């Protein structure tokens, strides 16, 4: 069984009810944070997970709304890990991830220096193990395996999706993308597909070109549902709602998905959980 928790279902626009894009995946006693949008650790704490308990951080791409709280994750994990010789945090993402992590740590160098000067048991900066990938296996530990494949969020490039597998259960996390062959292949036969969705029918009517532009490189509800159908997944989990999902409108979004996908559809607020079982 794999458990998926939608930590942040929001967008780049601040929302008092939704944290920035982030998803928690629990499998085989391991805990993976996929993207780290604003407010992610507060939502994780509400779900019973602290930064020190993360097995790895997985980044789909380097847009600010998906990595905005990277510094908080790095520093909070560092100061809340009390075991000697802490294991470096594995950070897996597309090319550019190492530069982003290094720049983030450099921006926080004063804070890091203050804490090292103050605490005798902190004698080194936060330990990280950054790995950049665009395709193939990236994790194989205690029965949990993860592989990545390219997605299409151009001009943001490269971008990747993740497939997590454990004891026959499988979950694919698409990140931001339009329909593409890489995601179709990655999601083939998966138990669940976690996919960003936007209401292009609404966004296209907003009289600001900059906002209309987001239609170019995101999937609509119907497009995400069509991807789920092509890939033959069991459950479509929609997240990163643009515009924000309003209470009472859930059935509108479900109806749009149902035009293309006959399977189970999950959507909801931050901390919504979905259990994904192995096929019986």
From Swiss-Prot:
Keyword Nucleotide-binding in annotation: no
Gene of this entry: rnz
UniProt keyword annotations, A-Z: Endonuclease, Hydrolase, Metal-binding, Nuclease, tRNA processing, Zinc
Superkingdom, taxonomy of origin: Bacteria
Family stated for the protein in its record: Belongs to the RNase Z family.
CDD domains hit by this protein: arylsulfatase_AtsA-like_MBL-fold
Required co-factors: Zn(2+)
Protein name: Ribonuclease Z
Family annotation (NCBIfam families): PRK00055.2-4 (NF000806)
UniProt organism field: Mycolicibacterium paratuberculosis (strain ATCC BAA-968 / K-10) (Mycobacterium paratuberculosis)
UniProt xrefs under InterPro entries: AtsA-like_MBL-fold, Metallo-B-lactamas, RibonucZ/Hydroxyglut_hydro, RNase_Z/BN
Free-text comment on the cofactor: Binds 2 Zn(2+) ions.
Subunit comment: Homodimer.
Residues reported in the UniProt entry to bind Zn(2+) 2: 65-66, 176, 240
């Amino acid at each position: 069984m794999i458990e998926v928790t939608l930590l942040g279902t929001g967008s780049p626009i601040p929302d008092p009810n939704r944290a920035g894009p982030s998803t928690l995946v629990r499998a085989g006693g391991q805990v993976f944070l996929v993207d780290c949008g604003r407010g992610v650790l507060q939502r994780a704490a509400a779900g019973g997970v602290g930064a020190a308990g993360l097995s790895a951080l997985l980044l789909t791409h380097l847009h600010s709304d998906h990595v905005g709280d990277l510094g908080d994750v790095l520093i909070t994990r560092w100061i809340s890990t009390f075991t000697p010789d802490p294991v470096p945090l594995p950070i897996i993402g597309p090319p550019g991830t190492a530069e982003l992590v290094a720049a983030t740590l450099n921006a926080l160098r004063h804070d890091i220096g203050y804490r090292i000067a103050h605490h005798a048991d902190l004698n080194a900066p936060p330990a990280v193990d950054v790995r950049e990938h665009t395709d193939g296996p990236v994790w194989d530990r205690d029965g949990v395996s993860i592989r990545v494949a390219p997605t299409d969020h151009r001009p943001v490039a490269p971008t990747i999706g993740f497939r997590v597998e454990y004891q026959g259960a499988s979950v694919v996390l698409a990140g931001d993308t339009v329909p593409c062959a890489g995601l179709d292949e990655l999601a083939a036969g998966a138990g669940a597909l976690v996919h960003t969705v936007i209401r292009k029918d609404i966004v296209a009517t907003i009289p600001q070109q900059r906002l209309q532009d987001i239609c170019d490189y995101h999937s609509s509800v119907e497009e995400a549902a069509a991807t789920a159908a092509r890939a033959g997944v069991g459950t479509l989990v929609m997240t990163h709602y643009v515009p924000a999902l309003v209470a009472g409108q859930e059935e509108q979004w479900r109806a749009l998905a149902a035009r293309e996908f006959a399977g189970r559809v999950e959507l909801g607020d931050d901390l919504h959980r979905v259990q994904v079982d192995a096929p019986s």
